[in-house]
UniProtKB/Swiss-Prot annotation:
Keywords from the UniProt entry: Chloroplast, mRNA processing, Plastid, RNA-binding, tRNA processing
GO BP: mRNA processing; RNA splicing; tRNA processing
Name recorded for this polypeptide: Maturase K
Homology family: Belongs to the intron maturase 2 family. MatK subfamily.
Gene Ontology molecular function: any one: RNA binding
UniProt cross-references to InterPro entries, sorted A to Z: Domain_X, Maturase_MatK, Maturase_MatK_N
Amino acid sequence: MDEFHRCGKEDSFWQQCFLYPLFFKEDLYAISHDHYLDVSSSSRPMEHLSSNDQLSFLTVKRLIGQIRKQNHSIVLFVNCDPNPLADRKKSSYSESVLEALTLVLEVPFSIWSKYSVEGMNESKSFRSIHSIFPFLEDKFPHSNSILDARIPYSIHPEILVRTFRRWIRDAPSLHPLRSVLYEYRNSTENLQRSIIVVPRVNTRFFLFLWNYYVCECESILFSRLKRSSHSRSLSHGSFPQRTHFHRKIKHIIIFSRRNSLKSIWSLKDPKIHYVRYGERPIIAIKGAHLLVKKCRYYLLIFRQFYFHLWSEPYRVCSHQLSKNCSSSPGYFLRVRMNPILVRTKMLDELFIADLITDEIDPIVPIVPIIGLLATEKFCDISGRPISKLSWTSLTDDDILDRFDQIWRNLFHYYSGSFDRDGLYRIKYILSLSCAKTLACKHKSTIRVVRKELGPELFKKSFSKEREFDSLRFSSKAAARSQRERIWHSDIPQINPLANSWQKIQDLKIENLFDQ
C-alpha cells in the first residue's frame, strides 16, 4: 500500500483511471498471501504450519477466472471449515484474492483521504465511544426531539457497485468486485437472500465494504451540510476507515418526493445535531413537531430513491428528548444540569463579567441497569443476585471472562460519573452472581468458591479500577481531584446488556407500528 501511495502521489489521475492492470501484478498477491499466512499462523498450532506455503500465481489466475465465470463450485466465503488441514491451501488462495481486491479498491480512497485531510487541519478523529459526551453537552440544552434511525445493512450488489463508480473511473476494475459480490450472495449460506447483507466479519474486505457503505450513506445525505464553526466535530471529508461519531450541522438536505432527486433544497435550522454509533445514526432537533415529522419523512424517501431500498417505518422513529436520561449510545445515562458561575476579568481588573452556564453531570442509572440484569437472569427484579444457569456448562475461565467483560465495560463507561455508588452496587450484583454460577456448576457453596478463587475473582477489572483511582487521586490538590472525571476510552465492543436493551426497544417499536 505504501508503494501505491508513492505512485499515487506522482500521478493520482493515472491510479484512478487505470486500476485494472493492478490485478495482474504478482507482487500484490504475494503480499496478500504472506499477510494471510501471518494472521492464520497466529491461530494455528505449530505442527500445522508448513514450509511449502508458496504462492502460485497461475493458481490465482485460474481462481480469478472461475470467479468471473460465476463458478459456484469455489468457496470464497466460509465462516468455518470442517477440515481446516485439507482446505487450508484452497482457503489461502481465496483470502489472497479478496485481500488483493481490497488493496486495489483502497488505492483511490487512500489518495483522496490523504489530500483531503492535509487541507483540513481542524479535523479531529474521535475513535472512542466517549466522544458521545461532547455531543450530549450540546444536545441537552438545545434540543427537544430526537430521531433514532438504523442504517440499512442490506443492499443489492449492483447498487453497491454503482456507488463505487462515483469514486473509481476505471470501469473494468469494478468487474471483479461485481463477481465477488454476486458470488457471496449466491453462496450456500445466503442462497435465499436476494440482497447482500454486510456481515460483521473481521476481514479486510468486509471491513472496507462496510466502512465505504456507511461513509457513502452519510456523504450523500449530508453533502451540502455546513458545520458550526464552534463545534468540536469531525470533518465530514474524512476517510471511511475512520469512524464518525459526532458532527454538529447547520443545514439538512431535503429531497422532494414529487420530483424525485431533481429538486433539492435546504432546511435551515442552527440546532440540528448528528451523531452515529455503529449502525445507529441519531439526529437531535430543536423545533416544532412538524419539523421532526418532515425530517423523518425525507430520511425515508432518501433511502428509497437513492439506494432503492424500502425502509420499514419503525427503522426511523422519533420521540421527545428527555432532559434527565439518555440511551443513545446503547447505554443508559442519567444526567443533571448543574449551573456554574464563570467569572472573567481583564488585566488590572478593569472589567469583570459573570457568566452562568450549565455543566452536564452524569449519574449511574441504577434502576434501569438492574432491570436489564434481571432480564438477563443475573438477579431478580429487586436486585438480589442469582446464578446464571445458562452459563453453567461453560468452563470456569469462560464464566469469569464473561462476567469480567460485562463489568469492565460498565465500569469504563460510568467511571466518569460523580456519584458512583450505584456502580459499586452493580459490581456487588455481578460478583455475587458469578460466585453463585460457579457454585451451582460445581454443586458447592459460595463460601467454598470464594475460598478457592480468592482475589482471582474479577482480578483484571479490579486492577483497572485501582489504576483509575490512583490516577485520580495522584493530584496535589485533593479537593479538585475529587471533582475530576476521567473517561476510559478502551472499550473494544459494546456491552451485551446494551444489545439486549436495544433488542427490547426495537421489539416495542415494531409492535407499535404493527398495531
